[in-house]
């Protein structure tokens, strides 16, 4: 058994009928050459059956502790049914990009069956040009962006010939504990929880306005800042108590509306990594600076088209991995930064420089939070209280003002070509979730010389994800136009599902 962490549990607790914390990837496979096998549901199922022991997290299901006396556990599913988890369907003619995006939007809108392991794998046939899409859908409760990519290594090979994998060391399927056993475990852990809560309060309370998931709970900002001020007055806490809050004002936008549906829309685009690197090198900024600044330009142009651009800059939530090399695989080891997005800046070069400064300041604030505070926060609240507080925060987030306007996440993907069952992966698109209080989410995967972007919005959102994708392309061209070599982007291999150029 493996227990969920506080943040893992948060990902479960904040779910409701309209908000599901699910993510996915969409791998576009090249058409099979003559004589080469086509990737079908059966081919993929057989591949998973041979390799699933390499990803034990996929063999576990949830078991809750009665009365929420402790955080839930992952236990081996002795009845794991790959015929249930691996699925397939065919797109109708003509099988273009928009049909694929609609199908993926429908897939990520459907909730998981929580009595089974929280993942699904789909083979989508019928794409134009003979391509196939493989959709890997996962729940955020057991993976973050980095650990989700680790699970993909079960599917990925470095060559079309594949590889030999070691046999499982032990059989999967340990018996799940009974309800009474879980109750006894929860009761036995209460003294430990009390000790952790006391120690956690001393370490974490001054920094909760910078720590997930507490920073989104109403009132936390006031408590943390007051604690730091008091510590400074009495000379306690050292340099950490000099940490300032973001003091970012989140402007009202046309995106500010409560979630009314669980259904999502999704779109995707691909730009060349080398083009983003050219901008990075010319201006002496980071690749993430370029991605976020490009997104700022995209959101600005889209809001201008609607006549809804606020005078103040928008605020974006940027996840930051805190995973170390010796950390266990799986789970959520992530914190977040709040960053001012210079959507109020008309000039592209100035917008990039403002983004660089905003991200630099956010990183400095993030580094100022000691590791002891992060560890202390994990045990600050008793599980039953934490779960209720998380749910309350979700209900209030759409009513008392947003934490940020949008979410932008940048995740490094495979640096070289990978293959699934012998078929080369041409593009590797991400699918994020939409949370209460946020307009939309954008995730960027870097893969094999490209930046693959996915844009997710609620079905009834005024945001059109395809317009956002087009706006991102235009925004990157604006940055390229600032370079001495001119605006022409590098030649990008056609990897869109419908085989269209552009």
Indicate residue ranges for each PLM-predicted region.
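Acidic, low-complexity proline/glycine-rich segments
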Residues: 6-18
């Amino acid at each position: 058994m493996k227990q969920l962490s506080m943040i893992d549990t948060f990902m479960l607790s904040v779910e409701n009928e309209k908000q599901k914390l699910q993510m996915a990837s969409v791998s576009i496979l090249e058409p099979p050459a003559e004589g080469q096998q086509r990737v079908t549901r059966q081919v993929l199922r057989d591949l998973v059956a041979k390799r699933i022991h390499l990803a034990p997290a996929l063999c576990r299901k949830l078991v809750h502790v009665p009365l929420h006396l402790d955080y839930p556990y992952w236990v081996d599913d002795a009845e794991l049914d790959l015929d249930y988890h691996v699925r397939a369907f065919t797109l109708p003619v003509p099988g273009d990009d928009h049909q694929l995006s609609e199908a993926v939007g429908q897939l990520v809108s459907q909730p998981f069956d929580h009595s089974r392991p929280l993942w699904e794998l789909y083979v989508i046939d019928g794409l134009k040009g003979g391509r196939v899409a493989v959709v890997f859908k996962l729940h955020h409760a057991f993976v973050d962006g980095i650990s989700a990519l680790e699970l993909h290594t079960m599917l990925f090979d470095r060559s079309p010939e594949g590889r030999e994998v070691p046999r499982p060391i032990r059989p999967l399927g340990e018996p799940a504990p009974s309800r009474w056993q879980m109750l006894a475990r929860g009761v036995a852990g209460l003294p430990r929880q009390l000790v952790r809560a006391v120690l956690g309060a001393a370490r974490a309370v001054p920094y909760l306005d910078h720590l997930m998931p507490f920073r989104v709970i109403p009132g936390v900002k006031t408590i943390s800042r007051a604690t730091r001020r008091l510590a400074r007055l009495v000379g306690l806490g050292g340099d950490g108590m000099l940490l300032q809050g973001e003091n970012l004002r989140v402007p009202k936008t046309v995106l500010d509306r409560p979630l009314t549906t669980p259904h999502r829309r999704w779109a995707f685009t691909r730009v060349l990594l080398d083009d983003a690197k050219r901008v990075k090198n010319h201006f002496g900024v980071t690749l993430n600076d370029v991605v976020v600044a490009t997104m700022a330009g995209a959101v600005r142009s889209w809001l201008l088209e609607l006549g809804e651009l606020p005078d103040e800059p928008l605020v974006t939530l940027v996840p930051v991995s805190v995973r170390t090399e010796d950390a266990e695989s799986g789970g959520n080891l992530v914190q977040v930064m709040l960053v001012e997005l210079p959507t109020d800046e008309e000039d592209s070069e100035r917008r990039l420089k403002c983004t660089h400064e905003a991200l630099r300041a956010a990183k400095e604030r993030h580094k100022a939070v000691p590791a002891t505070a992060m560890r202390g926060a994990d045990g600050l609240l008793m599980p039953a209280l934490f779960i209720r507080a998380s749910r309350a925060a979700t209900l209030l987030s759409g009513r008392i003002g947003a934490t940020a306007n949008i979410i932008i996440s940048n995740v490094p993907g495979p640096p070289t070509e990978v293959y699934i069952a012998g078929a080369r992966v041409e593009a590797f698109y991400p699918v994020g979730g939409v949370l209460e209080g946020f307009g939309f989410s954008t995730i960027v995967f870097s893969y094999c010389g490209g930046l693959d972007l996915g844009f997710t919005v609620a079905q009834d959102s005024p945001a059109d994800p395809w317009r956002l994708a087009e706006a991102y392309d235009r925004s990157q061209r604006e940055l390229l136009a600032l370079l001495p070599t001119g605006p022409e982007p590098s030649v990008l291999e056609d990897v869109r599902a419908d085989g269209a150029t552009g």
